[in-house]
Design a protein with these regions (language model features):
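Key DNA-contacting residues within the recognition helix of helix-turn-helix
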Residues: 22, 38, 67-68
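Short, basic-rich loop-to-helix N-cap that marks the start of a DNA-contacting helix
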Residues: 43-57
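Short C-terminal boundary/hinge segments that cap the last helix of small helical domains
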Residues: 49, 59-73
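Helix-turn-helix DNA-binding elements, focusing on the entry/boundary residues of the two helices
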Residues: 18, 34, 52
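A short, basic/aromatic helix-end/turn motif that makes direct DNA contacts
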Residues: 24-27, 59-61
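A short, Lys/Arg-rich alpha-helix, primarily the initiator
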Residues: 1-18, 22-24
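Recognition helix of helix-turn-helix/homeodomain-like DNA-binding domains
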Residues: 27-46
Length: 73
């Protein structure tokens, strides 16, 4: 499960919305769609390790504790 509020706040802080984050993920080799991303944000499916790694890289989440707080709730 993901802490959606924490992830969304980090997205806003870094200047991303769902569409732009998905586009950047695709540019970095993690192929996903906005619908798939939305399903993961609503808990219908889960982010995998590749997703989490790329999202953390894009959003400049470097601290392991912060990564865990977002993706290991």
């Amino acid at each position: 499960m993901v802490d959606v509020n924490r992830l969304r706040s980090r997205m806003v802080l870094m200047g991303y919305n769902q569409r732009t984050l998905v586009a950047e993920m695709n540019a970095r080799g993690v192929k996903t769609s906005e619908n798939t991303f939305s399903s993961k944000m609503t808990g219908k499916s889960q982010f995998d390790c590749d997703d989490a790694d790329v999202i953390c890289d894009i959003l400049e989440v470097e601290e392991p504790a912060e990564k865990a707080a977002i993706f290991l709730v």
